Design a protein with these regions (language model features):
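Short, compositionally biased low-complexity segments enriched in polar/charged residues
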Residues: 67-85
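Non-cytosolic coordination micro-motifs
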Residues: 25-65, 92-172
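Short beta-rich binding modules
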Residues: 87-89
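C-terminal segment of classical bacterial N-terminal signal peptides
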Residues: 14-22
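Bacterial N-terminal signal peptides that target proteins for export
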Residues: 1-10
Length: 172
């Protein structure tokens, strides 16, 4: 009866809260106001190294055409560059594998600052979320241990029109 339902509801709520517990955001130490050598707000249309792969009106998504996708020197599955009204505002990186995940975490910490390693701060469970928050840029990484797949968003925080079209959902 009631006790069984209350216990089940409590178990569901507990699991939902702990399945994807994010780590606390840490300050982004070196905010480059962009991604690699491309400042936020830049037009990608004139840049030869990019090809448009999707066009959804005010949103356009590009990929680099003359090189394999890599974050630093780490090979990844894909890197996509999103513009909103022709202004560069987001990079989405997808990758697979626990070894790649560890290499990417090391790379991001060397570039943007160390994560808070206080016990309880780093996530446990099937979904791990890490966030670096700067003045111009936010870097958010989500890794699912069950599928060994990760996604990273590098996003402009200062682009006047926030990219709120739903493409920043962390789904694979």
């Amino acid at each position: 009866g009631f006790c069984k339902r209350a216990t089940l509801l409590a178990a569901v709520i507990f699991y939902a809260l702990h399945a994807a517990t994010p780590a606390l955001a840490v300050p982004l130490v070196n905010d480059l106001n962009g991604f690699e050598d491309i400042p936020w707000g830049t037009s990608l249309v004139e840049r030869e190294q990019f090809a448009r792969v999707e066009d959804a009106g005010r949103l356009a998504i590009y990929e680099q055409i003359k090189q394999a996708p890599a974050l630093g020197t780490i090979p990844v599955d894909s890197i996509r560059f999103t513009t909103f009204e022709k202004k560069f505002g987001r990079v989405t990186v997808r990758y697979s594998g626990s070894e790649t995940h560890e290499r990417i975490l090391t790379y991001l910490q060397s570039k943007y600052g160390p994560l808070d390693r206080t016990p309880g701060q780093i996530t446990v469970g099937p979904v791990k979320v890490y966030v670096w928050h700067g003045f111009h840029t936010e870097v958010a990484l989500r890794f699912e241990t069950g599928t060994d797949r990760g996604i990273i968003f590098f996003e402009s925080l200062t682009l006047p029109e926030k990219l709120s079209d739903g493409t920043s959902a962390t789904v694979f």
